[in-house]
Amino acid sequence: MKYIGSKAKFADEIVAILQGYISEYKIKQYVEPFAGGFNIIDKIQCEYRLGNDIDPLVCDLIETCRDNPALLDSLHTPTREEYYDVRDNKGNYAAWYRAAVLLFASYNSRVYGGCYGATAQTKDGKTRNYFEESKQNFQR
């Protein structure tokens, strides 16, 4: 998942080091203290994996989807107006829904104070749906 502070660019290097220790010492449980966009933990091969994060948006979304995975299937790409309404009116939306909209539809994943970035026009004139891409990456 695209996420501010993402370790995606360095995931291959980080995973190689961690996986080496996990394999060498036959470690059964891996704890990711800063799961964020899940760019490391999703690549770790271990019997048990536990992801943690301090960001309540990430935690709300993870916990809710763990208990009800079909929720994300019902989400549609928000319009610009919907995005700003969700961002600016916290109390009007369920925590998991707010998290999904802000995490998946913020420009460059700048959730707090961010701006709409769910879709964009590519150089060849096509529309790229970052919201759907982020949602699908999260569901993996």
Where are these regions (language model features)?
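SAM cofactor-binding core of SAM-dependent methyltransferases
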Residues: 27-90
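SAM-dependent nucleic-acid methyltransferase catalytic core
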Residues: 1-17, 23, 65-140
